[in-house]
């Protein structure tokens, strides 16, 4: 006999949809028919518009179903935005996995002398990021579709920031770190926000292996801001 959860999973598999499955010690198995790191979404659209202050600027954001943190800018992204320090090396900034755009747009607004690239695999999120850039009159940006960094292999960056898709799995996140190192200029920096319970210690260890260094820049409410600098 199958459990009720097993029958639900079998029914979903028969639909042919992409599935994201996460296992948590407290919450058990969670089955999601779509997630924010999916390229396309069949979830019905239900756009919402709201205001949010970041780095002293009030932004108007439009969000939708099937995008990350649609009701407000999540705490981890806010902490990353507030903790980030402009690198000493000149060059562009990359918001890796931009979603509807809060990280990239807020940094572009403040660092007007820098060009900010914003990439994501989720087509709905990219459309929202473009709308939010226009609505907030942010012009020093380029928004592209990219699965990790595969769509911007021709670019090098002074800084890369990411709130990585933890539920996509550790291997995906660590691959993002590896690709980010290759995409950085010498003395460029990778900034990552990740919760302790979702793997901050192992993420720091991976960054140390890749870069030879990794620093905890901030810790609040279980969220870690990690920075690694490329020296060669």
Predicted regions and their residues:
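N-terminal auxiliary segments of SAM/dcSAM-dependent transferases
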Residues: 9-55, 66
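SAM-dependent Rossmann-like transferase core, predominantly class I methyltransferases
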Residues: 40-89
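Conserved SAM/SAH cofactor-binding pocket of Class I
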Residues: 76-162
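Class I S-adenosylmethionine-dependent transferase superfamily signal
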Residues: 107, 179-181, 207
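A short glycine-rich, Lys/Arg-flanked "PGG" loop and its adjoining helix->strand segment in the class I
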Residues: 174-186
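Conserved beta-strand signature within the Rossmann-like core of class I S-adenosyl-L-methionine
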Residues: 187-194
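Conserved class I S-adenosyl-L-methionine
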Residues: 195-212
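Core SAM-dependent methyltransferase catalytic element
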Residues: 219-232
């Amino acid at each position: 006999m199958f459990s009720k959860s097993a029958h639900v999973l079998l029914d979903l598999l028969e639909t042919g949809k992409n599935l994201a499955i996460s296992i948590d010690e407290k919450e058990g198995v969670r089955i999601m028919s779509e997630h924010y790191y999916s390229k396309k979404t069949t979830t019905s659209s239900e756009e919402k518009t709201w205001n949010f202050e970041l780095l002293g600027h009030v932004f108007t954001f439009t969000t939708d179903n099937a995008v990350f943190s649609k009701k407000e800018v999540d705490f981890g992204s806010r902490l990353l935005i507030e903790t980030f320090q402009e690198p000493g090396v000149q060059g562009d900034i990359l918001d890796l996995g931009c979603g509807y755009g809060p990280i990239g747009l807020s940094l572009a607004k403040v660092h007007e002398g820098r060009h900010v690239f914003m990439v994501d695999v989720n087509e709905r999120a990219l459309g929202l990021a473009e709308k939010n850039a226009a609505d907030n009159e942010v012009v020093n940006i380029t928004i592209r579709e990219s699965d990790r960094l595969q769509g911007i292999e021709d670019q090098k960056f002074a800084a890369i920031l990411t709130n990585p898709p933890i539920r996509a799995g550790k291997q995906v996140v660590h691959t993002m770190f590896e690709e980010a190192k290759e995409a950085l200029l010498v003395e460029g920096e990778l900034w990552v926000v990740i919760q302790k319970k979702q793997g901050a210690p192992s993420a720091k260890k991976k960054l140390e292996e890749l870069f030879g260094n990794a620093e905890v820049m901030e810790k609040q409410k279980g969220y870690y801001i990690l920075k690694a600098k490329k020296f060669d």
